[in-house]
Each structure stands twice: as C-alpha cells, then as structure tokens.
C-alpha cells in the first residue's frame, strides 16, 4: 500500500441525495502532502476496504482535504459506510496523493468534460486554472439538476465558462471536431461518455487528450473467464486461477500482499509485472506500452500460464 496517514472527518455535507462531501484533516501532522489538481487518495475503511476518491479541495489549502462520495446501490458497501457511519470525529487511513490525472502545463486552452460524479477531479483543477489566468471551458452533463453535484457552486464560480447539459446528450463529435493548436481536452464520467470522448478525439494530436476512469468492468465479470495459471518468479510456485476467481484473489490467498483500491481496473493500484506469457487485459488504466510488461491483478486474466515478477 502507498504511504498511509491518519485522517479525521471534521465536516460533512450532503451535496445531493446520493453524494456526501467529507472534509478531512491530518490527525498527526500539521498539513497534508502537496498535490496537483486531479489527484486522488485511497481511503482505508475500518473493515479493510480500500476506496479511491478524487481530492476536490484547493491544492493551495494543505490543512484540509475534501472528497465527494457517491452512494452506489450496487457497490460493495464502502460508499454506504461512508454515507452512514463516517461522522464528524471518525478516523480513517488515507494514502498520500496519487497523480494519474492532471492539467497539461503546456496547454494554451483546456476543455473539461464531466458526467455526474465525474466532476470531482476537476474541482481541484479549477483553482489552478483561475490562478493561472488560463483559457478554459467546462461542460457538465447530468440526468437532472438535483443529481448534478456542486452545480450551484460551479455556476457561481464559472459564469459563462460553464455549459450545463441536463437530461440531454452532449454532442462530443461536434464539440471536439476541430482541435485548435495547443488545446487539450479532459474527460471523466460514465463509461459511455468516456468511450464517446475517445471516439470523438481519435484524430487529435497524441498527448492532447486525458481521461480519468470512474468505472471499469464489474467485479463479478473479473471473476469469470477461462482458467489459467501463474508462476511466481521468486519461488517457482505455480498457482492455478480458476475460471470463477480473480488473479487478485488467488495471489492474496497465497500470501502475496498485492495492493488494490477500485478493484475494477481503473486505478492501477494492483498492477503486477509480467515476465512471460500472454495477459488478457481488461483494465482501463494501462497504456499500450505498460500492457507489454504489466497487468492489473483485479480484472485482467491470462491465457495458459503467466510468469509474474513476485
């Protein structure tokens, strides 16, 4: 696990019927480590569950962090616990900030596209954009105004930089048809929106599009597929991975302390190095180059036998 810190809940706010915002302070230090907009932390719950949340607070305020938690009816209980039991005074463990999504410093213009709870990584980017005097616009899609977290604050802060799309589909192909030189586009939202963004920006210059995934494949699907085997390079042990179990489960049962947070192939916490064999990738976080030498243990599988650098 990444470096952990003790944190305390000092405020909570019901942003929408399904989204609660928690304000955290460090329990044993004066300030949190520095981060850039778009970073996330992993919260460790009392039962050991680990959940990834974007930091929504201003990076220039290191004395407090804020996260927004969407209550997921089909989740594994982590979001429900935070909604029901994380009262003021509750202590948790949190990882140091992790930066997989960030503003491109070389960009002349930024287009930010969010769907629902996908607005959260952008909330910590907006203060950076304002301080830099940057050229930017924000497109925010939601099923209804009641389900659009932080919408009143965004309208007040952004004015005509904000375009809101309520109960209507944003025409990504039209919006992103002609990338101006120096423009970078960023997207975070439901899988369908992210896929549409990828298709609409397929012709953009390499390195000018950026995606944060909040969903991958369901955990039940990760536990389905053909059986395969893994060889542990350090010991030569052969571990069978049955068709109805994930590689992560098998590795942990064998005593290998592989980290994990989202467990749907989006965060990269459970990446293991592959020395041989053919992985069957199901993640949404690894680049093509990274996939040649690593895989996510939570959702990806293998064909035949894999050799892992463990």
Show the residue positions of the predicted features.
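N-terminal pre-ligand scaffold of iron-sulfur
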Residues: 224-260, 273
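A short, sequence-level motif marking secondary-structure junctions
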Residues: 37-39, 56-60, 243-248, 285-288, ...
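A short, compositionally biased
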Residues: 36-38, 221-228, 266-268
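Local cysteine-cluster metal-coordination motifs and their immediate loop/turn environment
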Residues: 121, 252, 256-281, 287-304
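FNR/FR-type flavoprotein reductase catalytic core
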Residues: 79-236, 240
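Short hydrophobic/aromatic patches at helix-to-coil boundaries
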Residues: 307-310
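Ferredoxin-reductase
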Residues: 2-91, 95, 108, 142-145
